[in-house]
Amino acid sequence: MTKYEILYIIRPNIDEEAKTALVERFDAILTENGAANLESKDWEKRKLAYEINDFREGIYHIATFEAETTSEALSEFDRLAKINLDILRHMIVKVEA
């Protein structure tokens, strides 16, 4: 299994309840599609380098997990993050051991 890290930026004006539901939903997408050893945590609210969708800051969230390279977890997360309006940007990287 390969170790991956996902960093995504959530819009800053989301209420706490909706943010928790969003994070739980995307964590479930990963685990239901073959990801293991998931660690998910809020990083912090930070100012963005440039404006995204009229927002100047965002809530950074980071998730680390292990998955097979052929796993659906990565592609499904990527697909759903692109169409979710609460996620401003996301990035998936493979962690070198």
From Swiss-Prot:
MF-aspect GO terms: small ribosomal subunit rRNA binding; structural constituent of ribosome
Gene3D superfamilies: 3.30.70.60
Keyword terms of this UniProt record: Ribonucleoprotein, Ribosomal protein, RNA-binding, rRNA-binding
Pfam families assigned: Ribosomal_S6
GO CC list: cytoplasm; ribonucleoprotein complex; ribosome
Highest taxon of source: Bacteria
Record-linked CDD domains: bS6 (cd00473)
RNA-binding in keyword set: yes
Any single biological process term in GO: translation
PANTHER family assigned: MITOCHONDRIAL 28S RIBOSOMAL PROTEIN S6, SMALL RIBOSOMAL SUBUNIT PROTEIN BS6M
HAMAP family: Ribosomal_bS6
NCBIfam families, sorted: S6 (TIGR00166)
Family: Belongs to the bacterial ribosomal protein bS6 family.
Function comment: Binds together with bS18 to 16S ribosomal RNA.
Protein name (database record): Small ribosomal subunit protein bS6
Lineage of the species this protein comes from: Bacteria, Bacillati, Bacillota, Bacilli, Lactobacillales
Gene that encodes it: rpsF
